[in-house]
Every structure is written in C-alpha cells, then in structure tokens.
C-alpha cells in the first residue's frame, strides 16, 4: 500500500511541531519528505536516521527538509500524524460484509483490520510500538487514540442498541491502550503483531469492557445516517477530546 498524501487541510497544525505547508507545491514536497522518512524508518531505527538521510532519500536539498522540520523528531511526529489519519480512516470504515452480530465480534473485526494495516506499514510499527518512542510521538499517538475512541462509541451505537454507559469513550480508550501494550509486546518479540497476540489483545479489551457492557447487545438496522455520524473531524478534537 502506498502512503496516502496529506492535503493542505490535513497537514499538521503548527502546535504539532512541523511547519505547516501552505501551498500546493509545499504540500507535495512535504508528502515527499514524509514518504522518504517512512521508507527509512521501515528499515532503520529512528536513532540511525538524520535529516541529511531524509533529504537524500527524497532527492531534495537539505535546506528543503529544514524548511519543514527543525530536527528529525519533528519529521517523525509529522509522519505519526499522517499515520494517525490513515489508521483513523481504517478504523471508521463500516463493517458490512459480513456485519458483526455481537459487540465482541465487532471488536475482533476492527482489531484484525487495524493489525493488518500496521503489519503492512513497518514504519508505523516502529513509530508506535518500538521501544524508543519519543514523548512527542507518543503524544501524537495518544491524540489519535482519543479520536478513535470517540468514533468507536458511535460505531457501537450504529450497530447495536446500547444502554447509557458513563464515560464510555474513556472506557474505550483504556481498552485501546491495553491492546497497544500487548501489540508492543508482540512487536518486541516478533517484529510484527502476530495473530496470537492480536487475539490476546482483543480478548483483554473484551474482558475489560465486560465490566461496563452487557454480554449481549441487540442489533439494530445499519443506516447511512448512523454511519455518517461515526466520522469526527480532527478539528473537533483540539479543545475537548471527549466532547460529543
């Protein structure tokens, strides 16, 4: 799978460290640099990558890299944010063939799809699950997880009649964090998320959510309106991640 490019509207905001590309040509150059960074990270640890190497891999002058990224960590954060968007879009893609009939099955299907995505993108595995994750990259990862948790609640509501559960978004975020921890263990031992550890992580998330969810949730007819509601613009996350 080739990396999806960011549009100008999707480019990271200044508070995420990298300079925001403002024009079409700048956006194109920005995505070229992120593509190069991803290729390098797929084969090398972040400590072994320099801005000069990114420039060489992208076949652009080093000054062009400095225009967007003051240091290599800024490039890694920008790449993490791009991965966040791709992972988010994957996470909200409807499950229609077949549709899940239980909430436990829904989680298995969503998690299997997420694991397949990350296993297909070695740089994403290294950035999010590697031992040397920087604080800035980790914060970017957490911001992405918060957005996924908000949409995950709406995903549940699209497929099932669900009772009111206080702080359900936060419960979903905790379940996701526990899954990430087991995936990181798998990555550390095997270099990818194995199916065994994927199932273990999903089982852990299900056991945790059983503290709050009934074992059985009645299905509801899937509607286009409910599916459209799942998407949350990233701009809505800035002030209050748990706002509905």
Predicted segments with their positions:
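Alpha-helical DNA-contacting segments of helix-turn-helix folds
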Residues: 41, 76-83, 90, 144, ...
